[in-house]
Curated annotation (Swiss-Prot):
Belongs to the class-I aminoacyl-tRNA synthetase family. IleS type 1 subfamily. This is Isoleucine--tRNA ligase. GO terms for biological process: isoleucyl-tRNA aminoacylation. Its cofactor is Zn(2+). IleRS has two distinct active sites: one for aminoacylation and one for editing. The misactivated valine is translocated from the active site to the editing site, which sterically excludes the correctly activated isoleucine. The single editing site contains two valyl binding pockets, one specific for each substrate (Val-AMP or Val-tRNA(Ile)).
Amino acid sequence: MTDYSKTVNLLESPFPMRGNLAKREPAWLKSWYEQKRYQKLREIAKGRPKFILHDGPPYANGDIHIGHAVNKILKDIIIRSKTQAGFDAPYVPGWDCHGLPIEVMVEKLHGKDMPKARFRELCREYAAEQIARQKKDFIRLGVLGDWDNPYLTMDFKTEADTVRMLGEIYKSGYLYRGAKPVQFCLDCGSSLAEAEVEYKDKVSPAIDVAYPFKNTVALAAAFGLAGIEGKAFAVIWTTTPWTLPASQAVSAGADVVYQLIDTPKGKLVLAKDLAEGALKRYGFSDGIAILAETTGDKLENLHMNHPFLERDIPMLNGEHVTTDAGTGLVHTAPAHGLEDYAVCNKYGIELYNPVNAEGKYISETPRVAGMSVWEANPVILQWPEETGNLLASSKIEHSYAHCWRHKTPLIYRATGQWFVGMDKAGSDGKTLRDKAIKAVDDTEFFPPWGRARLESMIEGRPDWVVSRQRYWGTPMTFFVHKETGELHPNSAELLEKVAQRIEEKGIEAWFSLDKSELLSAEDCEHYDKLPDTMDVWFDSGSTHYSVVKQREELEWPADLYLEGSDQHRGWFQSSMLTGCASSMGRAPYKQLLTHGFVVDQNGRKMSKSIGNVVAPQEVYNEFGADILRLWAASTDYSGELAISKEILKRVTESYRRIRNTLSFLFANLSDFNPIEDAVQQADMVEIDRYALVLARRLQERLAGGYYPRYAFHFAVKDIVSFCSEDLGAFYLDILKDRLYTTKADSRARRSAQTALYHITRSLVLLIAPILCFTGEEAWDIIGGGEEDSVLFHTWHEFPAINEKAEAELVKKWTAIREAREAVTAAIEPLRADKTVGSSLQAEAEITAPEEMAGYLNALGEELRFALLVSKAEVKVGDELAVAAKASDGEKCERCWHYTRDVGAVAGYETVCKRCAENVGGEGETRHYA
């Protein structure tokens, strides 16, 4: 008896269904590194148009977290997809190496008691150790880049070019020194840039304090009264009592309506809109009378006494005064608030700062000298109470600025700092703010809402404090006049000389420099080296100049910057400002892409205390990096990205669908040689030509749309849908009969394999930017072997097809698919009640509208293959309907179809006539399915 199972084309797949990624990925990485894949790619891509994604440098401290992984994976998908789209897309990874967090770690490890040069040396060593750890993890994610030659902000050349960028901004006229209030962290002992500030809720004392008017006659005139009997007070409300010793004025809104109210305390001046709430706070319900009203402009230049110090307090008009809360009058301390500083500066009031760099009151401050501002709060609360000027005291919870590193509250404190001015006219007569806003207009944003966000931040941001009083940072290499504070007149030339030294020896070249090496003896008497270092955001914000402009393989401006949404106020902005403030005069990027933060499945932030942290190391060790990459790509990054074990298991199911599809494709291509066996398109079976159209259209959607627009979640959705619906549930389901049962080298089978070959090559190329390990594993089989790489190839080129013919083909097979779905639905009840086991055990009678019936009948005897039934008949009717029943034929042992011709051919008693022909004759022919 013949064993017909040996006559079917069931081949083993060289692509296993189980990926075993976690174990196999490291070996692939090792092999790619040994083959110098990245370097070979640069040679292959030489001469192509450039695409530059400039890497925003992660900070060189601690292990990478899941947010780092998302960021690097998204960048890698873009680099790979651009490469396959025909660009030369080099990727130079970078690290941010200077700054306080590293100082803090070095102090913890080695203490503080050492020479500063040794301290900086240890900081450099620590940063290098952290970079090595992070680099290993980034490479493990499959991120392709020049890992042997990354950029580091602590590289001597980069440090030198950061100094040169400082020189650019100096020459542009935007740099100035000023004693302005800046956000100051007492734990850092330094000013903070806006990007280093985060807002959290804080409970603060809220007090109403009365300032006695000196001259009630002038006050009466302001309110249009003949006179005022008794005492009168301007009442302020503040949540920072510690600033009261620095109070130098009270501000009123010029257009705000104020009332003079008679109360048991005396006459009080309060904003009309806030008076009722204020009087309730003071417990005044009886004996109240509104005497008069006026506007704030009439109160200007009236004078009061300080509530507990001997100090004259003028009334000013300030644009910052609102009637949202409080009293409508604002106590004004120019040393401790930007708006306070601005209004006092306008009125020529000299700044007084009683708080030192440690956050303690100077010795001249009565009662609180030597106390920290937080310790002094309760003492200061008692002070106006003793003088009878405290009207109310309570607690309030409000959003307050905190240090992003120490999580401690900040203070505004006036210090002598170096600023990049936003509204100062530069050497070209334009302000930096105007230039930056124009640069925003010239930038493309992904997602689009990023434009409004960055624009509003630039419109509202203060001048950029670029100086720091730290040790581990790029120095501000200026010589400053000892008496005037002015910069040396030859600063531009001196900066370049210093930069040349730093290029050779690093920042230590400045710190160890004796000024006599660069200055004349006379200049040495009058000028000192500036001890300040630069804000680390200046370091990273200058990398478009120090890296992109300097490295031969890169081009300025970059095409794309891609970072988390917090970088609108961080790296995106600092890069924008250095680009616009320098001779480049524009943003250093053409596009900005923003991704959200990673949260757990319940939308909560990752937190060790909650126990919901998902570490990338755990994910790639358990699931493989390709699963992490697929998760990152399949999640809409424009919002928060949710991750958990359950979510990753669902992602694994999508991966399995793609992998199983590839395994099937490779099994059925294992005896196919495209050079010898391919069938010309005109000679292909019709459904194979239709499948090629579906595959080509998938490629067009991804290569021509989703990848260039960075819409990776749509790309993943389309790939999975193509594998499960177009291939798995339709084309491959139909194809199995032809692949398995026709003669191995028949046109019918070779036509199918030709289609599968094109589909497989295209599919592997399409998944490769996302599933880089799986893509390369597959390309080893269908490409040029182990030394070849999917990245060495651009998108697949499909056989050309006439547009009109394609449209007709798609229309026809769309109708056939619709009919097939109706047939499948009609058979389902028969399967449910066990009347039939598989659809091949059924017959279908289809009623269809004329056009659809024509398409179905055109397939003739092959219609049953397309519908996966053993027999199909079609008649014309008004609408689609299907009647299904069990076949009365006999099951063919070889093809499993139920027919009435089993055993019709002598010697083939258990198989149908078609199978007898395929086994012993010339083989069947197919035209449609």
